[in-house]
Amino acid sequence: MDYKTLTALKPSEYSDAANGFRAVSDMASAAKDRIDMQIIGAMKSANEGEAATAAEGQLQELAKNFHYTQAECGLISTALDGFAYDMGAAKRKLDAAVEDAHAKNFTVNSDGSVSYPSAGEKTDGKIPEGGTVTALIGDPAADAIGRQAARFNPNPNARYAQEYADRIADALKEATAADEKWAPKLRALKADDDLTVSDRDWVDVKKDTAGVLEGAEDYLHSIKELPKHGTPKENAQW
């Protein structure tokens, strides 16, 4: 995950997509329940014979498909919400660092480095020059030396620029970790190109569920409980 990509990323778009998959999951659930609880029962009461039995079997298979759609779309929704939650945290850190840099009239470059203007007391009649710094995240010893050098720089802007560059790099590191966590989980959420929901499909659902719930732990813990005695507006917001 690089600076330009995270800057352009909009976590809300993934949350919106999650809402769409959640709506499909809900519709599939409703369709499954209607087939199981209403249509099949009505058919049994009104029809008999081989044709009725065959039709009932087809409806049961259709209900299985709706059930599978409900489960898979629910998992995709949760995964997208988890991804948006993790990326949102990283994006807020990035935006805060960039905002602080801009407040000091620094320039954040396309690679995440930070350029700062000349400032400080004159030396030999000259104001200390500005410069550009990159993040000091890697070897602890080298990082410590770099930060110490920034503190002793006659230009006071150097220290602040180094701080902002490090914060930007921290945000990018967090976003990269989120991307690496969620990309394989989302790629795994795919169905076979057929209309038969097999035992193997349900084994995959169970496996996918475990992976998604593990990855979305922080997101799920962030969800507040339904307000007790909440108003209709509060319940809708929840």
Model regions: which residues?
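N-terminal secretion-targeting helices of virulence/extracellular proteins
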Residues: 1-200, 204, 214
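Long, low-complexity, intrinsically disordered regions
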Residues: 201-238
